[in-house]
A protein has these predicted regions:
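Transmembrane helical cores of multi-pass ion-transport proteins
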Residues: 1-294
Length: 294
């Protein structure tokens, strides 16, 4: 669908999506993702349907708080607190020492990797001799390489499941990718062609399933890091891909002991910034009351 829109030069449609609508969509997505990760963060064993509407997930999560596991919650909540503490510390350092601002930025960008590695080592020390009965939930075995490579097969029952979610998926992909492209185009003083962007992301998602890939779209965090690094062309994506390939074939065994609660903390931390403060809505109201209502 996305590739067709790009080939049909329908990218101009994106320009008609108002900023408040994009903001509201991103906030809603962030709330949905965060609410679905609380179960893993606390190690809850209750029957919580994380694919249900956000309000239902929040209600079920609160009801099932007694099922939270202490060790899982500790690994998740401490990791989440550490991520925010590191970010605040590096931001404070950048403000106090502007000459080292870029160094603090890169240290802040690496905080997620540091926390995952730290808690994986802690988990290794605790669970090394009790793999069959770990103290808390672990990621477990991660297959090496492209074990799912092949011609994808879409069955009728799978199509029925995704049809109802397809419009939301397309809108989410469009908004996120174009938002990333426009943001960094504005920062680095270049103009993007929305139709060209749609063709690129559409073809990527057409070829991805042959290697067992998840649907792809623009990434705020990685784009920010590349922009700060001085990247000026898509060639940086090739460098990233090579590093990921090496990791897929050599480092997967090291992922076994990563606590699931820590991964939930990382996800919540990553998407939490998409939830805008209340004064943003007030600013929309000052500019255009109708847009704020929308």
């Amino acid at each position: 669908i996305i590739a067709f829109m790009g080939l049909a030069r329908l990218g101009f449609i994106i320009d008609f999506i108002p900023v408040p609508a994009i903001t509201a969509f991103m906030v809603g997505s962030a709330i949905s993702i965060c609410s679905g990760q609380v179960k893993g963060l606390l190690g809850q064993t209750g029957n919580i349907d994380t694919s249900a509407p956000s309000y239902r997930i929040i209600i079920d999560t609160l009801k099932d708080l007694p099922t939270a596991q202490g060790y899982d919650a500790a690994m998740g909540l401490i990791a989440l607190a550490a991520l925010y503490a590191l970010r605040s510390g590096f931001n404070y350092g950048a403000e106090k020492k502007p000459s080292f601002a870029k160094i603090f930025f890169f240290l802040g960008a690496l905080r997620t990797v540091f926390i995952i590695a730290l808690f994986a080592l802690i988990s290794l020390g605790i669970n090394q001799h009790r793999r069959d009965n770990p103290a808390f939930a672990l990621v477990g075995n991660v297959p090496k390489g492209f074990d799912q490579a092949g011609v994808p097969v879409l069955k009728a029952d799978v199509i029925k499941l995704i049809v109802s979610q397809l419009p939301a998926c397309v809108i989410c992909l469009l908004i996120e990718h174009i938002a990333v492209a426009k943001t960094f185009g504005r920062v680095n003083n270049y103009t993007i062609d929305p139709s060209q962007e749609l063709i690129a992301i559409g073809i990527t998602n057409l070829l991805g399933p042959f290697l067992g890939a998840f649907p792809a779209t623009g990434a705020f965090s990685r784009s920010a890091i590349q922009s700060k690094s001085g990247a000026r062309s898509p060639f940086t994506g090739i460098i990233t891909a090579i590093v990921v390939l090496i990791a897929m074939y050599t480092l997967t065994s090291g992922l076994y002991y990563i606590p699931k609660a820590t991964l939930s903390a990382v996800i919540i931390h990553a998407v939490g910034d998409l939830i805008v403060p209340p004064n943003t809505i007030y600013q929309f109201w000052l500019i255009a009351p109708l847009d704020a209502v929308i």
